[in-house]
C-alpha cells in the first residue's frame, strides 16, 4: 500500500491513514470523559476492557481469555496496567470490551442504554463489544474515503470476517 498507494481504515473507520504519505486523513476519538466511564461500566459487569497504544494492547485484566484472543488476532503484545482509566491520557479511537459470549447481548444492551447519544457500542464477534465515538462505522468511513479520492461505490469492494463488517460489505456491494 505504501508503494502503489492505498489507505488503511482502522478502528472501525474511526481512523483513515494514507499509507504512501503516512498522513492521517480522518481521526475520530472517544470523548476523554468516556474512558473512565467505560472502564467503570466494565468493572461493574466484571469483564475486561482494553484499548491500544503504540506498543500494543493495554488492559488491566491481562490474563483475561478474551482479551488475549485480541492479542492473538492482532499479533500485538499485552501491556498490563493497574488502572486503565488513569493510564489513558491520550486520544483513543476505540475501546474493546471482552467477555464470555453468553453475556455479550445483555452487556451490549446495557452499554448501549448507558452510553446512548455519547458513544456507539456494538458486537463485533461473539466475545467482543466495540465502543467507538458516536457515528463511527465502516460503511461511513468508506464513503468518506471514496469522496476524498473522487471515486464511487462502483470502484469499491470490501472484505471482512466480523459482525461489524456487514455494513461495509453491504455498502460496497461486492465483498
What do the PLM-derived regions correspond to, one by one?
Residues 5, 13, 92-93, 172:
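Short, well-ordered alpha-helix to beta-strand connector turns
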Residues 35-37, 41, 45-159, 163-171:
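Conserved acidic, metal-coordinating active-site core of Asp-based
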Residues 1-27, 32-33:
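Alpha-helical substrate-recognition element adjacent to the catalytic core
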Amino acid at each position: 500500500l505504501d508503494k502503489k498507494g492505498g489507505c488503511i481504515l482502522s478502528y472501525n473507520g474511526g481512523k483513515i491513514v494514507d499509507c504512501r504519505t503516512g498522513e492521517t486523513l480522518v481521526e475520530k476519538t472517544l470523548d476523554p470523559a468516556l474512558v473512565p466511564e467505560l472502564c467503570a461500566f466494565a468493572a461493574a459487569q466484571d469483564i475486561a476492557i482494553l484499548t491500544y497504544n503504540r506498543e500494543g494492547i493495554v488492559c488491566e485484566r491481562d490474563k483475561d481469555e478474551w482479551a488475549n484472543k485480541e492479542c492473538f488476532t492482532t499479533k500485538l503484545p499485552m501491556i498490563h496496567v493497574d488502572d486503565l482509566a488513569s493510564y489513558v491520557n491520550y486520544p483513543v479511537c476505540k475501546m474493546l470490551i471482552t467477555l464470555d459470549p453468553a453475556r455479550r447481548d445483555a452487556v451490549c444492551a446495557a452499554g448501549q442504554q448507558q452510553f446512548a447519544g455519547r458513544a456507539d457500542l456494538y458486537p463485533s464477534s461473539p466475545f467482543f463489544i466495540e465502543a467507538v465515538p458516536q457515528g463511527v462505522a465502516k460503511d461511513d468511513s468508506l464513503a468518506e474515503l471514496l469522496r476524498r479520492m473522487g471515486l464511487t461505490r462502483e470502484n469499491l469492494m470490501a472484505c471482512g470476517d466480523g459482525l461489524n463488517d456487514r455494513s461495509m460489505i453491504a455498502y460496497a456491494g461486492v465483498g
